[in-house]
Amino acid sequence: MIKIAPSILAVDLINLKDEVKLVDANGAEYIHIDVMDGHYVPNITFGSNIVKSLRPITNKVLDVHLMISPVEKYINNFIEAGADIISFHPEADDKPFEIIKNIKNKNCKAGIAIHPNIKVAEIAKFLELIDLVIVMTVVPGAGGQKFMDSEVSKIIELKNIRDQQKLNFEIEIDGGVNKETSQICKNSGADVLVAGSYIFSGNKDNYKTLIDSLR
């Protein structure tokens, strides 16, 4: 079954812990944490302290997406805070292979995120080393954007590579995921769907229904 990763980018931060507990109790497998530095992307969001504060309240996968540059100097902070998966944009640092090795050597899963401007061929060299590929279906930097249909071909391409080479990475979709676009992603080969506004702008009593509607 496809996994759902509610994105706390869309949460009212005053109620962050309560909201995470709610989606945890209502079927989410991952909690997605978007980290933005105001440099790689124009927005600024969370640091490793948010991961540290969430770790004691959920045993679900803390799925950290770093939209920062440079990357390497901050990796250990997120590992020590309790991240289960750390994904980054390889073009944002000049040592992507070392970063992947560092993450995995510390019993954390490593992922690569693909900006809409980046082709699958440009990150293919990492695929045998990583646990997750995030296909960005919006331009990184803000929540609530419209799903980019042009990126669906990347999902299909990644699934074909995985099948042909017998690799083990998950394919995660991040951006504009709702009831309709989730089916496109699922049918194209996605394993994990990140959803922020679709879930957290709804009624708290309906979180289970909203999460289940994405499967």
Per-region residue spans from a language model:
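Alpha-helix-loop-beta-strand connector modules within alpha/beta enzyme cores
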Residues: 44-64, 102-111, 151-171, 175, ...
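N-terminal active-site wall of soluble small-molecule enzyme domains
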Residues: 35-102
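Glycine/Thr-rich beta-alpha phosphate-binding loop at enzyme active sites
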Residues: 37-45, 49, 116, 124-126, ...
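Structural motif
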Residues: 26, 57, 81, 106, ...
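Glycine-rich phosphate-binding active-site loops on the catalytic face of alpha/beta enzymes
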Residues: 86-94, 134-146, 188-210
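Conserved, mostly hydrophobic/aromatic
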Residues: 16, 23, 34, 78, ...
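Catalytic cores of alpha/beta
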Residues: 19-20, 72-80, 118-130, 175-193
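Hydrophobic faces of well-ordered beta-strands that scaffold small-molecule active sites
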Residues: 3-7, 31-33, 54, 62-66, ...
